[in-house]
Amino acid sequence: MSIDWNWGIFLQEAPFGNTTYLGWLWSGFQVTVALSITAWIIAFLVGFIFGILRTVPNRFLSGLGTLYVELFRNVPLIVQFFTWYLVVPELLPEDLGMWFKAELDPNIQFFLSSMICLGLFTAARVCEQVRAAIQSLPRGQKNAALAMGLTLPQAYRYVLLPNAYRVIVPPMTSEMMNLVKNSAIASTIGLVDMAAQAGKLLDYSAHAWESFTAITLAYVLINAVIMLVMSLVERKVRLPGNVGSK
């Protein structure tokens, strides 16, 4: 099959928005990057908290961490997106729910729902990576810290977590890349990200190959930058002889 490529389509004026088709994709690129960064901040913070809880010698706290992981890992992500956008606002206090649904700009509604959903979903995966990293450390590190008079929180803060951070960099790279790819699902609830803009470009120009090739390259570019940055971080924090070092 012969494909008639026309990359000049991106420089043509879009039907609305006072911009070109390339401007549409650039706008979607910015939304995708913003969503990925904000969702990752949520995922990192929440995931680390619950990951630590899963390793503490307290059955209630560790059970709480397990419940969180099982809840978010075992429900399809697209279902979670629609739950956060359509169901959760109905469960909020009446005034807050009405403000979110009636007064907040729809684009902000889409973004906030997507950010929270993607962040909490990814946090469950981060939680497991943190748990695995802490449990992979030699047991003697924790015992030695406690024997020196440190409390359990101090042992985590000064001994276990600094070493776990170094172990966890490679799997965190994968989770960040997965988050970027999963962000495309946000277009199903109305967020105008790269995937949505590519769909618009296809609808108005009928150039499917060009539009989806362009966003494919954009996703590859974002993840390539993540890989490069995290590779530098991994080399920076690596300690000779430590777990995970070469």
Where are the predicted features?
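Transmembrane alpha-helices and adjacent helix-loop boundaries
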Residues: M1-K246
